[in-house]
């Protein structure tokens, strides 16, 4: 058996179905308890001068191994389990010993063990990326198969070692390489590893979705359905896997799902088939192109209808309530059938723009006669034009999406791996790029964003390095617009409604303004709502920028870290806080009559520490 009794090896090399998280961080899932016990039971070697070369290799006792080899031990000689010294060094990640044995003539691709594996196979099973890199640099062949018929990339997939998968593919290993059964890595992932990864990770490398294996002629989608792997089915459908290919039994993926009686997968496949069938109709394709516009129009009409019902000439609030319930029921049907799930995230944006539209119409139609010629009117017009401009700039400007070509991605992966930096702190497994400082992957936009602040619901856009300053002005002018409409509402009531606030109090006053103009009260409530959240966010943003020098994401992350630490972290004492004036100058990229000069940093390509000449501080990621 390969590697019995060693604390730093995987003792079970079978390839059955594995639970989610199997093999992550370089440790096999089934290894956890057995390996922990083995490590505890493994005795310490007090005197290494008498141990044999196999044990010395396992423990990484370099001097003892060197002594025995120079005394005449053949490094190619396998032990009684048919395992070479290079295998033992590889599985225990003994880099210095591997270099030494290879220099003494060890065969880098020597087969050994029960599974007839190479040292590279053993290193991959354990997730030892540095060892994999070293063996490949010394000529190891990643295309060789072991006794189970798996090559290097298949083992990396089965054990869910994503960094090794990325490195092998970047070094030229085909993502569509087949094992002895004609199965690609994507097929093995969909069938053997329950969960979204590494199926989703493999799809980043554009594997063939519709290739079939030799024996069953199943596609990756067939294998995912056969295993009941819901996450893999979802990933493959999203990537565009065919629903019509039949296997050797003449079964489509839906036929297999029906046979297995997996109701969730059946629903997913039928829904996807219906959506793809609708794509054939020109009207449906036109509706998809106009989804956002239709969503906006629906929101505008719905908000008008709500106000119309409230302003309806009837004293029966029961009738108005029934009409409102009916309205919301009817309008909820439209997004469900005509607007895709991905575009529903723009619903708050449509609500905001619809609110501003009716705010403007109310001001122009109802409030204009009372405020015509006054400076408040022109201030309102300026505020709403500025709001629309900065909303557009916030939405249309690239927030700082990090981009890289396929070749650049592979070069980055190789560079990071060979420098020991290929981990989740510096590498994005979704974008396959090196992450700049202060960046974060947004799962809504599906991209890494430089100097990430948040994904704003109200703009439907990420807020980052490229559009953060526009976002501040967007909040400011939205607060101004809502503030003017609140002021205009009270001016309107004082001019057009008979109120007795001083005589009868607040409750009577509210009844009087509701009876006078429910529409104006409705618009006031909308304006008050938008004024509240926009003003709160504006003040919060300005505080973070001027006094902390942090983004919203960084502030929240530091606060979470502080909860798990004995000593409370100070948000003011961060490398990014350069003082009130310098923080503002850096953020808005403007000086102050030569007293303060901004430091220009391109956060989309900033991977190392930054030296700030103004304060002689070193900026680091938080």
From Swiss-Prot:
The modification N-acetylmethionine is found at residue 1. It is a multi-pass membrane protein. InterPro entries: Ankyrin_rpt (IPR002110), Ankyrin_rpt-contain_sf (IPR036770), Palmitoyltrfase_DHHC (IPR001594). It is an enzyme of class 2 (transferase). It catalyses: L-cysteinyl-[protein] + hexadecanoyl-CoA = S-hexadecanoyl-L-cysteinyl-[protein] + CoA. Keywords: Acetylation, Acyltransferase, ANK repeat, Cytoplasmic vesicle, Golgi apparatus, Lipoprotein, Membrane, Palmitate, Repeat, Transferase, Transmembrane, Transmembrane helix. ANK repeats lie at residues 43-78, 81-110, 115-144, 148-177, 181-211, 216-245, 249-277. Palmitoyltransferase that could catalyze the addition of palmitate onto various protein substrates. Palmitoyltransferase for HTT and GAD2. May play a role in Mg(2+) transport. This is Palmitoyltransferase ZDHHC13. It comes from Pongo abelii (Sumatran orangutan). The lineage of its organism: Eukaryota, Metazoa, Chordata, Craniata, Vertebrata.
